[in-house]
């Protein structure tokens, strides 16, 4: 078939198709044909559908040399907006981006829980709170589905760390599993009915999630009545019969490892019944039917979208995600430091000022249409002549990508030439260049991070082949330059024919390329300004390396990454920044992490900022206490200077428009309204998962149980650095007239009972602004039969108000969700009778109202 817009598979048609499928055809439908596509059965009109990563943008089918895409702010940034309408609109944009990439299924959103601050993929998820996560996911999925594309909730469940992620068993109590880790999925399914759910890599209580009948058959499909498709994470299938019988419909990617002949054998040996096979086939066919709404042709060419209205939406999202953590008074005029004055000269300092930290690493990463650095955003707003830059220190973990600074030898275009060979290079101890080998492929590229998982060529069979990277580098100034080569495979880097980096002879295992690569090996070379220096990399794919990795996913041919920059004297650079800051009234210091530090494939070893960063911030604040500190990270970092800083922003990874979003908030074009979706501890040891985060002998104990994030800090009376829900504004708000009304308080079926929480919100300041009203419920401590958190978020709403404007905000919450805990003895939710308290919390520590809620009868319930 050429197009999915002709697919018409109603229930009767699907029954008919199943009856006409051969056994081999049925089996083929249950796995991918390649990295991103499902099998087609042309004789029966069953097309292939295309999937694409990921949660913050539609990358398309190519990690390697891919087509640029729109990049949304990361998951924690979207969670910080507390804006359901905005997230719905971003979902619509994602659907349009999927269609531009010829994709029918989007592999997002990610709704795992940040039980600690170190998770490599923590930036992908919305929040440490399951209600915020679930409601945000429902809005996201609704927006994607509104555009005719199928969203995928991932990863079911407890994929909360990267360390040994395919081997580790998350040991979690049934209560914590239900109240914290499954609840986001439950709420998202209740609110949006997304067409697909992806299972996680890890085990849950000893059994891999992708073959867990308890998770897939009993809870997801049985209790919740979920009717969509269940697909594996990529290479996250571990069995034949167990996975099929548990309810895993689609193994990805292809070619299959556990379906195909192995599944045929399981059928003939009665380990899998044909009835069960037909159930799995039906779900795949229903997924194809759902995907037909997109009207995207099969194997459509990938294209760019990059519309003006999309850029405006992305800028709005970037600005609305920035959290104003502190805004004390200026020593000079007794007014709040922010917003800044665009007419004044602004000094911009720091490692994140002149780089685009727009997304985290791993499957969430993509090649953006464009990026905006904080320095660029500020210069565009104030004028380049009003902005001065000082580096201060570097913040990279791996050296900055070199590709865009290279030029091709043949034409002088930006980038380099990438040649692929089936033959290895001639054995030699010296530089030989490309030699007499004939390349089977030759590409012009600019991105010098080349992950080859989805590279293909007719003359390449298997994962073993070779490649060269060649170009010239003309540095702007003379000096010692540092170069880095990271590989999942083997690699040698030559500069002007001299071996500078050997990442082949002796290799050290690292975390690159989803955990299958090496550490970055570095070397130095003196370069002359204005001279064209020859850069050449000799690369062999992953099978040419003898490195062994445990507990990680293997991605075939591997990849290479080439970085480089001028070597920096950090002490001298900090001193230069301090001298400039002492002479400037308006200073912005941009620090933080990037996709080097936060990525799928590994967890952070600590919460600290990169070396030199804290020294830079402290030194600048000593001479300019009014300096504004901007932190970019997807999850919490330590800020030992936070008490000293007077103005502080948390800016996350803001997508394409990150720099503009930061500048909009700094200069008051956007009034900050975001709130922290995560608790920021003062130090790593303060967080509740501190003693039990990594895998130990194949298991990780969720020892904090239900006391994740703010639930722990409230219970332990431990004040963190910044609490969940914290975020300031340039205006002021006042809450009043809290009212709580319950419908059907005595109904035997608690699903007939609901709460209506209403509160009056007034903008009492001089600027337009948006207020986020958070609704918490406090259980009755005197009558609870089990220990419970002090309070739990149950709903929220965001409202935009002009100065002096007053509006009523109303939030509906089912009574069951508002008052229940998971009763392990009864295997059900229990809403106990007693006197609860409903809190409405706004901006500011004292802006809280409380109202009683009397639950008259105890009731149990299951399902959605």
From Swiss-Prot:
Glycosylation sites: 434, 447, 503
GO cellular component, one term: extracellular region
GO biological process, one term: cellulose catabolic process
Pathway where this protein functions: Glycan metabolism; cellulose degradation
Molecular function, one GO term: beta-glucosidase activity
Gene3D superfamilies hit by this protein: Galactose-binding domain-like (2.60.120.260), Glycoside hydrolase family 3 C-terminal domain (3.40.50.1700), Glycoside hydrolase, family 3, N-terminal domain (3.20.20.300), Immunoglobulins (2.60.40.10)
Keyword Membrane: no
Keyword annotations from UniProtKB, A to Z: Carbohydrate metabolism, Cellulose degradation, Glycoprotein, Glycosidase, Hydrolase, Polysaccharide degradation, Secreted
Domain of life: Eukaryota
Stretches assigned to the PA14 domain: 411-578
Primary localization class, coarse: secreted
Compartments it resides in: Secreted
E.C. number: 3.2.1.21
Active site (UniProt): 233
Known role: Beta-glucosidases are one of a number of cellulolytic enzymes involved in the degradation of cellulosic biomass. Catalyzes the last step releasing glucose from the inhibitory cellobiose.
Family note: Belongs to the glycosyl hydrolase 3 family.
Listed name of the protein: Probable beta-glucosidase J
Source species: Neosartorya fischeri (strain ATCC 1020 / DSM 3700 / CBS 544.65 / FGSC A1164 / JCM 1740 / NRRL 181 / WB 181) (Aspergillus fischerianus)
Gene behind this protein: bglJ
